[in-house]
Amino acid sequence: MIFKVFYQENADEAPVREKTKTLYIEAESERDVRRKLEGRPINIEYIQPLEGAHLEYEKKSPNFQVLEISS
């Protein structure tokens, strides 16, 4: 499944909406997403599963690129 992760680049600062970034990652579950991203200095705000029409819509974005991280 593909997940969209909303995050802040600096894990030590309070989240500011204008600085929120996104990435796409393939994983089994939200827990798997967190496990794959642990060790990165980011502050995960929200993990959104993408499927169906929503996934197709996101694929049309020029920023859609699935991050490849092995388990």
Swiss-Prot record:
It catalyses: RNA(n) + a ribonucleoside 5'-triphosphate = RNA(n+1) + diphosphate. GO terms for cellular component: DNA-directed RNA polymerase complex. Keywords: DNA-directed RNA polymerase, Nucleotidyltransferase, Transcription, Transferase. Its EC number is 2.7.7.6. GO terms for molecular function: DNA binding; DNA-directed RNA polymerase activity. The keyword Cytoplasm does not apply. GO terms for biological process: DNA-templated transcription. It is an enzyme of class 2 (transferase). The keyword Transferase applies. Belongs to the RNA polymerase subunit epsilon family. NCBIfam families: PRK13667.1 (NF010188). A non-essential component of RNA polymerase (RNAP). RNAP is composed of a core of 2 alpha, a beta and a beta' subunit. The core is associated with a delta subunit, and at least one of epsilon or omega. When a sigma factor is associated with the core the holoenzyme is formed, which can initiate transcription. This is DNA-directed RNA polymerase subunit epsilon. It comes from Geobacillus kaustophilus (strain HTA426).
